[in-house]
Amino acid sequence: MSEALNVDIQEIAKFEKMAATWWDPDGEFKPLHQLNPLRLNYIDQTSGGLFGKKVLDVGCGGGILSESMARLGANVTGIDMGNEPLEVARLHALETGVSLNYERCTAEEHREVNREAYDVVTCMEMLEHVPDPLSVIAACCDMVKPGGYVFFSTINRNLRSYVETILGAEYLLKMLPVGTHDHGKFIRPSELIAMVDQTELLCKDATGVTYNPITGTFRYTSSVEVNYMIATVKPLE
């Protein structure tokens, strides 16, 4: 862990090694490609539409979500600390002609010159990969405008999530490389909401996400036992 930055060097290194396959729909990031339509729809519908809005994607990686939000007409900036994923993201945007901006920085660094600058902030599948998730949540709160939405997604920490996400997805189904996740870093919904409550953000909605290995598709569910997303809003002043 860096002393100055909220970064886990080992986590960054894992995703640097896999970066070349980020946009392969049948590669190591296949689950993200399968999940993306669901999370994109949730963000778009819950926020009242992304078209014309200024959006920040925290922990954007290779840009799967960032690019899809830009395709809906959002003015998107994606930030990440991985050099290789960002290079992949920039190259793919050039190849596909999608206009958006990528920067290498932490959420805390980006906040210094972007307070209350965004209509929507997304932080998806990222909190379980940093040493201090509360610090990221606070930075996201500071960067969204009053009345704007901040979205988080992560994985619950319990026996079922260990069986499905690590034993199932990494070891049995080979959906993800072994070691992608650390069960000890998963975040219970109560813990996430407790952290959100330490900021100005108000939790407005939560939904679970479940995977069907037979059809290879994700769908919404009322259960937040494994994967889940929450929508928060910053109150108007």
UniProtKB/Swiss-Prot annotation:
Gene Ontology BP terms: methylation
Q: Name one Pfam family in it.
A: Methyltransf_23
Per the record, the pathway is: Cofactor biosynthesis; ubiquinone biosynthesis
Report which reactions are catalysed by this protein: a 3-demethylubiquinol + S-adenosyl-L-methionine = a ubiquinol + S-adenosyl-L-homocysteine + H(+); a 3-(all-trans-polyprenyl)benzene-1,2-diol + S-adenosyl-L-methionine = a 2-methoxy-6-(all-trans-polyprenyl)phenol + S-adenosyl-L-homocysteine + H(+)
Q: Does the keyword Transport apply?
A: no
Q: Give the InterPro entries listed for this entry.
A: SAM-dependent_MTases_sf, UbiG_MeTrfase
Disulfide connectivity? none
The top EC class is: transferase
- Sequence positions that bind S-adenosyl-L-methionine: R39, G59, D80, M124
Q: EC number(s) for this protein?
A: 2.1.1.222, 2.1.1.64
Write one Gene Ontology MF term: polyprenyldihydroxybenzoate methyltransferase activity
Q: Which domain of life is it from?
A: Bacteria
Q: Keywords in alphabetical order, please.
A: Methyltransferase, S-adenosyl-L-methionine, Transferase, Ubiquinone biosynthesis
Keyword flag Coiled coil: no
Q: What does this protein do?
A: O-methyltransferase that catalyzes the 2 O-methylation steps in the ubiquinone biosynthetic pathway.
Give the family from UniProt. Belongs to the methyltransferase superfamily. UbiG/COQ3 family.
Q: What is this protein called?
A: Ubiquinone biosynthesis O-methyltransferase
Organism expressing this protein natively: Shewanella amazonensis (strain ATCC BAA-1098 / SB2B)
